[in-house]
Amino acid sequence: MTMDHCTENVQIWKRTDIVLTSGREYTNPYADVTLDAVFTHEDGTTIRLYGFWNGGNEFRVRFAPTKTGTWSYETVCSDSENTGLHGQKGKFFAAENTGSTELDRHGFVKISDNGRFFVHEDGTPFYWLGDTNWQAPNYVSLTRCNYPGCTCGNQFLHELNDRLAKGFTVYQTYFDIAESDGGGQRGITPEPGLWKIRHRQINPQTFTEKIDVMFDALADSGMVIALGYGVHSNTTAAMDIEDLKRVSRYLTARYASYPVVWITAQEITGEAQFAAWNVSAEITAAGDGYHHPQGAHQFPLPVDNEYVAALDGKDWHEFFALQAGHGPSRIPKCLYESYWNNRRSGRVKPFVETEANYEDITCGGFNGYAASRIAAWRANLLGSYGFTYGVTGVWANCYSTAGDTGWLGAYSFEPWYMGIDKPGSYEMTYLAKFFRYVDFSTLIPRFNDPAYSDLTEETKLVSSSEDAGTYAAYFCNRDRSSGILKGLVPGKEYSAKWYNPLTGKFAEIGNTVISATGQYTVPDKPTSADWALLVTCRTDLGAYETETIFCGETISAEIPAGAVVQKPEITCSGSHIHTADGVGYNTTDALCDGDRTTEWIPFAPMASQTILMDLKQVKNVCGIRITLGKNAVLPPYRLEGSSGQSGWTILADSTLREASVMENNGFREITEIFSGEYRYIKLLWLGAENNTSVKTIAEIALYAEENV
């Protein structure tokens, strides 16, 4: 919405632009003049903001009212003789927000009164579930989409709609503001760049026609934008400090009135870049009249690191945007505990894990499929009230299998349209579902405190509420052992439930827990997989989904008599390959063509692939036979079923027991027998040892009873 500095009605938490026309011509309006405005509510509340040049003689001040009632404003221009920009006044009325998102109903995000987590303006707890989209303003496209079978023509909206459907609440990104990084993408994206004159004059058209459109879509859909302006020393080495200061002001002017949380830039905690990014952050703080939470994305560092200490001492710094990093090793409990106990600044600061073990990338080792899930659960039980997920192809916008964009072949082996479907993104949905259900803001991490448990191993973690009414634990050990919870209220009735991080469903443990001593000996885990546990005396948490746990039951190799081979519609983005000339092809047709000499071929064998089979109607599915390709390895796999693509049930899991492999005329076959009413069957074909592995499938035969 725009206002030509006249009386208009706007809604709280919604952006409106006050449009001004310069009365003077400037050689470079971006650099030659500055504009500010003060907005004053009828109750005396003031919000100070920067204005920005929007092309030609047009300048704007962007504002989102935070209270209903009458607001007035007055502008200040560095050129006081410019009567079109200086001393302009206006008044408007702000009405209630009629939208339906959490941001519409509860307001912008801020830090809680106890300094531990994020809340909306009205105090409603905000659960941070982020998705990593580094450099998206530059390189994610609004004018093309190469997801297999998609005709939307907008990669950004395709990604956004997917993440909204999965319950993500934060879009984590930064600008490649110097246009000096890009992972091989610079100069090849279809949209124009950020600069008309490199680092000297911004290109307002790019912001108006692309980036504002992106950020409007994010805000209007209820997404908080975790926003930085550049990347470590890459940006600061490429850009003069005065140019960085100017663009920091410009970006703050355009986007401070959005639902943002500032992360300054990626990895600022290094000698070459620290001072420059601190200056940038100070400019942001001075021009953000909303005082959005402000932090800075870090390297993987302990709290006593000299740069972390310096960061902690800055007036503008309010929360820690942690990076656990990547690779097979786990960040120890004590590192998170040190941030939890940190009082260097004299106040408590929240921290959130914003980069840890992106799914299916290689960095310090190959992360694989499960690492993201484990990192997320551990972080949440260790004081991070939320988590930012990242996945191959999406985190750095690798657009296609052709070319070298987004570090393809270096950090990522697959493009965005393969990464977006990874199983980890669904498991983030289940993570958030659990912590919202248990009232995450009431939980306190207990680390290795013997007063609350004997869970001292790095693979066993627990949090509990202050009143001892709720315990949440997580076990990612590879055996079935658990432990003892302590500090329960003696004589109080508790319920105990396992929670499956792979399905988002609970399984009752048994009878009510009543402890005379305040201790509860947790039963062995249902399986050797990772499991969460909820023990609570609360009865007001609401309804929950349950499941019968798949424990790796013994299988039969015999398909039931009367079962008929089906012809499902099959989709798999992990085998959709674009050639250098842009032509796409997929080998999914080979999966159910009845010909074992044709093979389905994944693009990156080291990564996981999801093969989705749609029967078009609910049927009693009886089993599946998978014929491996010639000389193919057998990776770990999991089979799941659903009647409607939500609420998946695990049907088979080779990580819990070995698959039964039979020879049949020179081909190796796996047969899994199960029974249930399903429309969709999902085969998660997990990672092979390396990308030279042959991980092909010659044929899939899915069996079901024919509906009468």
Where are these regions (language model features)?
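Extracellular beta-rich ligand/substrate-recognition surface
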Residues: 54, 473-478, 596-609, 658-665
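Extended acidic/polar, glycine-enriched regions
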Residues: 38, 47-113
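Catalytic-core region of carbohydrate-active enzymes that cleave or remodel glycosidic bonds
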Residues: 313-402
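Aromatic, loop-rich ligand-recognition surfaces of beta-strand-rich domains
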Residues: 591-652, 666-708
